[in-house]
């Protein structure tokens, strides 16, 4: 869990991910509480997997995404179509994905203002 929503602890994600790499371990992070509220760049943080839920940054409920680093070795457990780059068969809710995308753009565009509000409080 990157950010704990109850006690506010923020895990030093990059440091922990680098430790995992040192020992050859794969790392998954629950970033549900941090994406859209905290600057994250998965090209600089070596996590292998991360989970995100759109409703946590004012996006539609019932949609999210899984970050899966190329070369992680994860393979599909559900056979079928080639959706989700062959990782998950099924029809994507395009309207919900579009809503999530827009909500995430708006959340990151307003990140500085949200930080000011938090500092004020």
Give the role of each language-model region.
Residues 1-121:
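Pyridoxal 5′-phosphate
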């Amino acid at each position: 869990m990157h950010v704990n929503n109850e006690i506010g602890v923020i895990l030093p994600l990059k440091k922990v991910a680098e430790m995992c790499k040192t020992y050859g371990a794969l790392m998954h992070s629950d970033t549900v509480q941090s994406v859209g509220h905290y600057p994250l760049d998965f090209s600089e943080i070596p996590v292998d997997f991360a989970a995100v839920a759109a409703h946590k940054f004012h996006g539609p409920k019932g949609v999210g995404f899984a970050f899966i680093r190329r070369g992680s070795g994860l393979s599909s457990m559900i056979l079928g179509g080639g959706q989700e780059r062959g990782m998950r068969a099924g029809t994507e809710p395009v309207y919900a994905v579009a809503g999530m995308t827009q909500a995430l753009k708006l959340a990151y565009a307003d990140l500085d203002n949200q930080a000011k509000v938090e500092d004020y409080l």
